[in-house]
Amino acid sequence: MEFSVKSGSPEKQRSACIVVGVFEPRRLSRAGEQLDEISEGYLSTLLRRGDIEGKIGQVLFLHNVPNVLSERVLLVGCGKERELTETQYKQIIAKTITTLNDTGALEAICFLSELHIKGRDTYWAVRQATEATQDCLYNFDKFKTNKENTRRPLRKLTFNVTSRKELARAELGLQHALAVASGAKACKDLANMPPNICTPLYLSEQAIALGQRFEKITTEIVDSEQMAELKMDSYLAVAKGSANPAYMSLMHYNGGNADQKPIVLVGKGLTFDSGGISLKPGEAMDEMKYDMGGAASVFGAMKALAKLNLPINVIGILAGAENMPAGNAYRPGDILTTMSGQTVEVLNTDAEGRLVLCDVLTYVERFEPDCVVDIATLTGACIMALGHHISGLMTPHKGLANELLSASNQSSDKAWQLPMDDEFQKQLESPFADMANIGGRPAGSITAACFLSRFTKSYTWAHLDVAGTAWRSGANKGSTGRPVSLLTQFLINRSENETTAVNS
């Protein structure tokens, strides 16, 4: 699909469809008023008649509006003008795109990016509208034999901004959105793959393919034999019961100077998590293919990064493994020696993600990173705490926390910081090893982060728990593509700071 931005009056636009807003109660937006004027009150007559109230979710599709150059006019309900929220804005865009895609209009000019959202500018409006459009049009039908084809799908969408002065910001928003949307799609496609196809080996093959596509990405694969030589025994224990061996995929993006320390993104890549010997309930176990959502988001962020050609160095790691029960699988009661030399008593084999990540977090010390961010569908406790709308952020480093929260706010890919006070560490005590792999039910997300923190002492580190945000259940089941937008914004901000430092 083709996107563009422009600045112009609605009455001068010649297109298959022009989209304008209607506010409650029955009041046209500025662009709507301009169309109403040239149509000699045609639109306002419809409003007075009650054809559309302006409530969010309402649409009115019109053909042959008098004196309007465009073939069609789509009136979209935008709610109360002064109370419009960010979430409502994205809902309005989604409703617009769904309607347009069903009408047979091949192109459209949209004036909804002119809507006022408190604290947001044109850059944000265009970026969010573009990302929401791509999300709305996403469909994963790779394995369907009877595919549903839209009669005449929307092929071109132009966002109109209020003045020419806003064009530069709008174009930047569009550029960033297209990169993020491309990364989010890559994340969704990878996460939605069935686990009989998306194995740890498959993850490594996708990482290699990404490196072949982008000149600045070099991919390195660490297989199980190499992990054994590195004494990554905690990681390997998780994969022991599976017929699919573990693979750790490292994507090195070299966009900065050779002496610039890399940012490291680590994604938990459990391509299927049965729980192991501590077997999960059968209900919804199919969704445990999404336990590689962290790795999928790192993969997507690396693609977005490469498309934006940012001047920084980043290493994206996909920590691939599969957790299955078997006669040789690891057990509750086992004591594992991690790559760091610290020992862990396994109390629950379904708390496996941290056992994979702890060895990867030790492995990345060799890169002397600027910072490390791990992304993982780590705990059900995070869903209990924050639901399905907000990712959990945990870090002992205030500066990095502020950066990630700022990126969250800028991208509207929400995260919330949870505490990591020393008192929580006591819950991980074991009478037989240096620590246990779980700390009991209370504050489960926090104690999981505390566990990981014991392997990150040599660098600045943060943990994103995306257990509640990486995928949706129910009728619209599927990967959300999160937190690709947050991660990409974090990297954009870092690159801008790097450029400023170089030029100062």
Curated annotation (Swiss-Prot):
Cellular location(s): Cytoplasm
Q: Which reaction does it catalyse?
A: Release of an N-terminal amino acid, Xaa-|-Yaa-, in which Xaa is preferably Leu, but may be other amino acids including Pro although not Arg or Lys, and Yaa may be Pro. Amino acid amides and methyl esters are also readily hydrolyzed, but rates on arylamides are exceedingly low; Release of an N-terminal amino acid, preferentially leucine, but not glutamic or aspartic acids
One Gene Ontology cellular component annotation held by this UniProt entry: cytoplasm
The EC number on file is 3.4.11.1, 3.4.11.10
The cofactors it requires, by name, are: Mn(2+)
Pfam families registered for this protein in UniProt = Peptidase_M17, Peptidase_M17_N
Q: Where does Mn(2+) 2 bind?
A: K268, D273, D291, E352
Cofactor annotation remark: Binds 2 manganese ions per subunit.
Record GO terms (molecular function):
manganese ion binding; metalloaminopeptidase activity
Positions contributing to Mn(2+) 1 binding: D273, D350, E352
Q: Which UniProt keywords apply?
A: Aminopeptidase, Cytoplasm, Hydrolase, Manganese, Metal-binding, Protease
Q: Name one GO biological process term.
A: proteolysis
Q: Does the keyword Nucleotide-binding apply?
A: no
Database matches in InterPro entries? Leucine_aapep/pepB, Macro_dom-like, Peptidase_M17_C, Peptidase_M17_leu_NH2_pept, Peptidase_M17_N
Q: Specify the superkingdom.
A: Bacteria
Q: Which SUPFAM superfamilies match?
A: Macro domain-like (SSF52949), Zn-dependent exopeptidases (SSF53187)
Enzyme active site:
K280, R354
Q: Which family does it belong to?
A: Belongs to the peptidase M17 family.
Q: What task does this protein carry out? A: Presumably involved in the processing and regular turnover of intracellular proteins. Catalyzes the removal of unsubstituted N-terminal amino acids from various peptides.
Protein name per UniProt? Probable cytosol aminopeptidase
The organism named in the record is: Psychromonas ingrahamii (strain DSM 17664 / CCUG 51855 / 37)
